[in-house]
Each structure stands twice: as structure tokens, then as C-alpha cells.
């Protein structure tokens, strides 16, 4: 059932009913203001999806990406975010600097990405709730695709120096960087496994 209370807040209660056994499989509820109707619908859809598939939630998720626009000779690349179904798109950066390779933290509260300012690659951390960007480090040469450790406390990336590209790990609590590979080869695109 769903109804708007005296404060114009939607109150929702639902049951997932098995028509064969004539029993409720699960039930839940919640509330939302009129602007949050899509979000509560996504949360209910997630509840049902998880119950039937056993998979992780999907409908109440976001996508972070690079949006490129403008004339060919003055392209702007902006960090952007939207709901998984394409709604609620918004830009997170102005397009003044080149931005690349955004990645959500495991909590989805932060985004790590590359920012090229004055042709120098910087690894940045964007806090979604506040809109605050923090520069984590500047690295000479090329820097590639920072990715989060499953616990959210480290980043892994590739850094190119003196003709070699090696894998480095940054501790986000101390900002210390540790080199993990030391080869003359090109070691790039590192990623942590989910199961540690």
C-alpha cells in the first residue's frame, strides 16, 4: 500500500507474495518525499531483485563517467554521474581540466580519477556528498587509471618513469606511495581482486 501522509510524504509498505504457497516471501516499507519517488521505486525493485536472484542490488546504483562535449578543437571532458537508468545526470567538474578514468570507491561515496592540469597528471579524489575535490598526488610522466582496494583505504595505479611503467599503491590514510613492481616492462591496468 502507498499513501501520502499529512506532510505530503509518501508512506509505502509492500509484500512480495508467492502465489503458489500463498505466503509472503518478504516485506518492507519506507517513506519518501514526492521528489524521491523514483528512488524508493528503485529500492523496492532492489529488494525484490535480491530476493529472487541472490545477486547484489542493482536498481538504486549510480554510474560515473566522462562526458565529452563541445567543438572538435575545444573539447571539454567533465566528470559526470547519473542513475543506472540514465536519469538524474549531473556534472561533477567544470571541464576546465582534462579528466579521465573515474572509479567509485567500494562505499560509492568517493570517486578517484585522473586530472591533467598544466599537462601534469594528478590523482584526485572527489567526495560526492560535499562536491569537494582533493588532489592526492602529482606524478611526473604518465599516470594510469587509479583503482580502489576493496577496503577503500588504498589505490592502485600505474606510473611511467624513465621509460618503464610500474605498479604503485597509495595508502589513502597516510598518502604514502609504495612501488609494487620494478621491471623494464610496461606494467599497467592493475586491479585488486574482490576476494581478499
Annotate each predicted stretch with a short phrase.
Residues 56, 68-78, 94-97, 114-123, ...:
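A flexible loop/linker signature enriched in serine peptidases of the S9 family
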Residues 37-71, 76:
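Pro/Ala/Gly-rich low-complexity, hydrophilic intrinsically disordered segments
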Residues 63, 111-112, 152-156, 196:
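Hydrophobic beta-strand positions that form the internal "hydrophobic ladder"
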Residues 1-41:
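Amphipathic beta-strand/beta-sheet edge segments enriched in Tyr/Trp
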Residues 57-59, 106-107, 150-151, 194-195:
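Residue-level detector of Asp-centered blade-edge/turn motifs that repeat once per structural unit
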Residues 83-100, 126-144, 170-188:
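Multi-bladed beta-propeller domains
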Residues 12, 61, 77-79, 121-123, ...:
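Repetitive beta-architecture junctions, highlighting loop-to-beta-strand starts
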Amino acid at each position: 500500500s502507498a499513501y501520502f501522509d499529512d506532510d505530503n510524504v509518501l508512506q509505502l509498505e509492500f509484500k512480495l507474495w508467492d502465489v503458489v504457497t500463498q505466503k509472503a516471501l518478504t516485506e518492507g516499507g519506507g517513506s519518501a518525499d514526492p521528489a524521491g519517488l523514483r528512488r524508493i521505486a528503485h529500492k523496492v525493485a532492489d529488494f525484490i531483485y535480491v530476493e529472487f536472484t541472490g545477486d547484489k542490488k542493482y536498481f538504486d546504483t549510480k554510474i560515473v563517467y566522462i562526458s565529452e562535449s563541445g567543438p572538435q578543437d575545444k573539447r571539454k571532458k567533465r566528470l559526470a554521474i547519473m542513475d543506472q537508468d540514465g536519469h538524474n545526470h549531473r556534472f561533477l567538474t567544470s571541464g576546465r581540466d582534462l579528466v579521465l578514468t573515474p572509479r567509485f570507491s567500494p562505499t560509492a561515496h568517493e570517486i578517484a580519477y585522473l586530472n591533467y592540469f598544466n599537462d601534469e597528471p594528478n590523482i584526485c579524489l572527489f567526495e560526492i556528498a560535499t562536491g569537494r575535490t582533493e588532489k592526492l598526488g602529482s606524478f611526473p610522466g604518465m599516470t594510469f587509471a587509479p583503482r580502489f582496494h576493496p577496503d577503500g583505504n588504498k589505490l592502485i595505479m600505474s606510473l611511467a618513469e624513465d621509460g618503464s611503467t610500474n605498479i604503485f599503491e597509495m595508502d589513502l590514510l597516510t598518502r604514502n606511495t609504495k612501488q609494487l613492481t620494478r621491471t623494464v616492462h610496461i606494467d599497467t591496468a592493475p586491479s585488486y581482486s574482490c576476494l581478499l
